[in-house]
C-alpha cells in the first residue's frame, strides 16, 4: 500500500523529492528492500503534520507535502490540485476536497469542509456541515481529503502551538492552524480517495487497484 502512494507521489512532476517518513523498523526495511527513499522519525509524533515537521528539521525545502501512507488511491491529479493554491505566495497551508457522495454526508469518518468564496477553509468537521435546516437538498457537501501542503514557516510554527480545543474534540489536526489564525486554502478535485482504516476498506481498495493493473 505504501508503495502505491510513493509511486503516485513520484508521478507528480511538481514534487522534487519524495520520502517515506516512518517510526517503524518494518516499514523502513520494506522501503529499503524496494528502493523507496525513506527516513526514520521519532515515535512521539502525534500527527502526520508533526511527522512532516520532524523531516523538515533535517531536510530543507520551501514547501512540504504530507500524504498519508494509508491512501493508496492518491493520484498525481490530487497533488496538482493541492499545490495549485500554493502558487499564491500568501497561502501558507493548502489541502484538497472532493464533492461528498450522498452516503458519506452523515458519516463521521468522512470529514466535511466548508470554505469562503476564495477557497479559504472556514471549518472542518466530522459533523454534517453545513446543516440543511430547511431540507432544501441543494447543498453541495464537500469531503476533505487528508493531504496537505505547508510552507516551511507554517510547518515550523505548528508544534509550537498548543493543541486546540476544537482539534481535541474533532480529532482533526488541521483545526490547530485555523484556531491560531493560519488560513488553509482548499483545492478542488473530482477524484475521491479511500483511506484504509478497516478490513472492508482494504478489500475495496484492493479491488479497485486490481482493475487498474
List the predicted regions and their residue ranges.
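N-terminal glycine-rich phosphate-binding loop and ensuing alpha1 helix
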Residues: 1-21
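Short, high-confidence coil segments that cap the C-terminus of an alpha-helix
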Residues: 15, 61, 88-91, 182
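Hydrophobic/aromatic residues located in beta-strands of well-ordered beta-sheets
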Residues: 18-20, 64, 121, 184
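Short phosphate-binding loop-to-helix
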Residues: 19, 25-84
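A conserved hydrophobic position in a structured secondary element of the catalytic/binding core
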Residues: 22-23, 74, 150, 197
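Conserved core of the sugar-phosphate nucleotidyltransferase
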Residues: 75-164
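Conserved alpha/beta core of the MobA/IspD/sugar-nucleotide pyrophosphorylase nucleotidyltransferase superfamily
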Residues: 139-213
Amino acid at each position: 500500500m505504501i508503495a502505491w502512494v510513493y509511486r503516485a507521489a513520484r508521478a507528480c512532476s511538481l514534487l522534487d523529492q519524495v520520502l517515506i517518513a516512518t517510526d517503524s523498523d518494518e516499514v523502513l526495511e520494506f522501503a529499503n528492500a524496494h528502493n523507496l527513499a525513506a527516513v526514520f522519525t521519532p515515535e512521539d509524533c502525534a500527527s502526520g503534520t508533526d511527522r512532516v515537521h520532524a523531516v523538515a528539521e533535517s531536510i530543507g525545502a520551501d514547501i512540504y507535502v504530507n500524504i498519508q501512507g494509508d491512501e493508496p488511491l492518491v493520484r498525481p491529479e490530487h497533488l496538482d490540485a493541492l499545490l495549485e493554491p500554493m502558487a499564491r505566495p500568501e497561502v501558507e497551508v493548502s489541502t484538497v476536497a472532493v464533492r461528498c457522495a450522498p452516503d458519506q454526508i452523515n458519516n463521521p469518518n468522512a470529514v466535511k469542509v466548508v470554505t469562503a468564496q476564495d477557497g479559504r477553509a472556514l471549518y472542518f468537521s466530522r459533523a454534517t456541515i453545513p446543516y440543511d435546516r430547511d431540507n432544501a437538498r441543494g447543498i453541495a457537501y464537500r469531503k476533505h481529503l487528508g493531504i496537505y501542503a505547508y510552507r516551511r514557516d507554517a510547518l515550523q510554527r505548528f508544534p509550537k502551538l498548543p493543541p486546540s480545543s476544537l482539534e481535541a474534540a474533532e480529532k482533526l489536526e488541521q483545526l490547530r492552524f485555523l484556531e491560531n489564525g493560519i488560513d488553509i486554502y482548499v483545492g478542488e478535485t473530482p477524484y475521491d480517495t479511500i483511506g484504509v482504516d478497516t478490513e472492508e476498506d482494504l478489500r475495496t481498495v484492493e479491488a479497485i487497484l486490481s482493475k487498474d493493473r
